């Protein structure tokens, strides 16, 4: 998928999604593309390392950070064969659903608009990562 800008625009056409980022997780742990001016553009290499690392129990108990925002993990199947999705929610008054999808080379991160249920993002994420996986991304 060479045109990430077009892909980001296509994902953001879904009115339930407020922000999106595509982040490398193997060789290059940086944001490849994101919504211009979006919060998820600030995802750090350290956060990617925590998301894809082998120590799952620490962030399941204490939560994790995505783009500097504290989140509590709802469901972690990010590294599970056949699933590849993590559901979380930002902490604080403006709690938003966060969904992270795993492909062979990248993580896709979605943040829902205020009031959007995480299950809706989860379903959308499964559709999106299926498409990326079929393209080898």
From Swiss-Prot:
Any one of the GO CC terms: cytoplasm
Gene3D superfamilies: Dynein light chain 2a, cytoplasmic
Compartments (UniProt record): Cytoplasm, Cytoskeleton; Nucleus
Transmembrane segments: none
GO biological process terms held by the UniProt record: actin cytoskeleton organization; positive regulation of actin filament bundle assembly; regulation of actin filament polymerization
GO molecular function, one term: lipid binding
Subunit structure: Interacts with ACTRT3.
Family: Belongs to the profilin family.
Function: Binds to actin and affects the structure of the cytoskeleton. Binds to poly-L-proline, phosphatidylinositol 3-phosphate (PtdIns(3)P), phosphatidylinositol 4,5-bisphosphate (PtdIns(4,5)P2) and phosphatidylinositol 4-phosphate (PtdIns(4)P). Slightly reduces actin polymerization. May be involved in spermatogenesis.
PANTHER family: PROFILIN, PROFILIN-3
Name of the molecule in the record: Profilin-3
Organism annotation: Bos taurus (Bovine)
């Amino acid at each position: 998928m060479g045109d990430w800008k077009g892909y980001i625009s296509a994902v953001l056409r879904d009115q339930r999604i407020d922000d999106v980022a595509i982040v490398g997780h193997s060789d290059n742990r940086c944001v490849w593309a994101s919504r211009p001016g979006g919060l998820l553009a600030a995802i750090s290499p350290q956060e990617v390392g925590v998301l894809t690392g082998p120590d799952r129990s620490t962030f399941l108990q204490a939560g994790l950070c995505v783009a500097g925002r504290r989140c509590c993990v709802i469901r972690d199947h990010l590294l599970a064969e056949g699933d590849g999705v993590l559901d979380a929610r930002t902490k604080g008054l403006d709690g938003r659903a966060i969904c992270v999808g795993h492909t062979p080379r990248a993580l896709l991160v979605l943040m829902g608009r205020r009031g959007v249920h995480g299950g809706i993002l989860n379903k959308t994420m499964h559709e999106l990562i299926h498409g990326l996986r079929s393209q080898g991304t």
